């Protein structure tokens, strides 16, 4: 009887452990797959502040380049590509959340003019579909279809991201006009240094929170350190927790100042933003321009023909 109860208890514990592991796996996977966009989406109504700064820069502190390429002009109700390039050295590795080294991911936010939006699948050409692949584009908000986000996605494969964009038609959307519009882009590579709640990730420098002497350094079993700093003037002790990943720069017995770096800076990524301009062109204006150019060309041809005819008449009169 006792053996049966023991087996039943073991079975329950195993089932509970498996369920807990599955839940943690799902939560962790969701957190990793949505990390870049979801932080901004949850914390900010608009990813671009009034100053022009894109909010991703609040968490990704290093400044890195980003580039965007769009056509100079587009016609209404047409699909075009907005190509975002996020360059970085493919050989470098970043510090992951567990302290190990891994490849960099990239992410981007594309802020289009009102009326522009992600092109529906049935409007995208086969060539463009092949270039885009299976990238999971999404709107920043269900009501903000002109703001698109992507990431994190593997940087080695997607350091260049092509957004398929559908231009609006002023005939059906009265809020849109044939004008020149700005487009804003932000792109990051690698993990951030600050979480939305203000806490630091393990992808940045850890600084001393107090001045004093390093009295003890304990290396934690799962990585990272506990550094005890003793203030000689009052005997107070402060323990700074160093997450796994960064390289320790201090040793026991060393004198520290407040905010002195305790670790190296492991960050190899960063964020950048840029802009471009695009003209929504009126087809009638294009037709008018073509008609004008054709008229000028025909006038020039007739002028040349008339001149040659006049020269022939002059030549015949001289011969006569």
From Swiss-Prot:
It is a single-pass membrane protein. One of its GO terms (biological process) is photosynthesis. Residues 1-35 form the signal peptide. Binds 1 heme group covalently. The keyword Glycosyltransferase does not apply. Its cofactor is heme. Heme binds at residues 36, 56, 59-60. One of its GO terms (molecular function) is electron transfer activity. It comes from the Eukaryota. The chain crosses the membrane at residues 286-306. Its main location: plastid. InterPro entries: Cyt-f_TM, Cyt_f, Cyt_f_lg_dom, Cyt_f_lg_dom_sf, Rudment_hybrid_motif. GO terms for cellular component: chloroplast thylakoid membrane. Keywords: Chloroplast, Electron transport, Heme, Iron, Membrane, Metal-binding, Photosynthesis, Plastid, Signal, Thylakoid, Transmembrane, Transmembrane helix, Transport. PANTHER family: CYTOCHROME F, PTHR33288. The 4 large subunits of the cytochrome b6-f complex are cytochrome b6, subunit IV (17 kDa polypeptide, petD), cytochrome f and the Rieske protein, while the 4 small subunits are PetG, PetL, PetM and PetN. The complex functions as a dimer. Component of the cytochrome b6-f complex, which mediates electron transfer between photosystem II (PSII) and photosystem I (PSI), cyclic electron flow around PSI, and state transitions. This is Cytochrome f. The gene is petA-A.
